[in-house]
Amino acid sequence: MNPPRGDAEARHTVILDAALQVFGQYGYRRTSMDDIAREAGIGKGTIYLSFASKEEVFQALAQRLAQRMLAGAEAARHRPGTTADKLAAMHAAWFGTYADTISRSPHAAELLDAKHRLSAGLVTDAGRRYQRLVRDVLAEAAATGELDLDTAGLTADTAAELMIASARGLESIAASSAAYRRHLDTLVRVMIAGLSRRLPAGPVPPGWHETA
């Protein structure tokens, strides 16, 4: 007899919460199902009711993290505010959440490593989906005339690629996840300001003098 759906989902959550702690502390290779069971406060056999192997636990946890980041970015996309506000909130949900996760656990980066054999596919797919979200926001802003991508020689796709690549690069200079979040916000606002459609220049303000 299968357990009630609510019980199965609750067990699934408890196992993945525990797995995040032990994978983050010891890394995938050093973590055992016994470690996960001990952290979860359940028997190892109970884990096998939800997952066939440690590999499945790892993949499910990576998928949960990626889905939460995407859900946060999707919600931010529809928030009130300017294009810069939306994209800054989206970057906070995607890159900021990732930075917060790895800052708390020495090995947590494995879970969202696009080169890890167990999570590469789903991480790559999630990254593409996030890039499409960013692209769509930029395309909408260009369509309304808020942004001028043409003058910069960009499409919405290439602008999204540039914004995301720049955000990744900022991680190497940030001293903390909080600093990274601040850098992300600044990056978005600087890029959007640079792409914003400008009105034709008006008369020179009184008292202004051009300097060489």
Could you tell me what each predicted segment is?
Residues A89-D136, E146-G153, S172:
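Short secondary-structure transition hinges
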Residues A8, F58, A62, A66, ...:
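Amphipathic, non-transmembrane alpha-helical scaffold segments
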Residues A60, E74-S103, A156, A160:
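Hydrophobic alpha-helical connector segments
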Residues A8, T83, A152-A160, Y180, ...:
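Short amphipathic alpha-helix in the helical subdomain of ABC transporter nucleotide-binding domains
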Residues G24, Y48-A52, A60, R64:
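Base-recognition residues in the alpha-helical recognition helix of bacterial helix-turn-helix
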Residues M1-Y26, R30-I42, E55-Q59, H78:
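Basic, helix-initiating cap at the start of DNA-binding domains
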Residues G45:
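Key DNA-contact positions within bacterial/archaeal DNA-binding proteins
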Residues M1-N2, A89, G96, D100, ...:
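C-terminal peripheral helix-coil segments that are non-catalytic and often amphipathic
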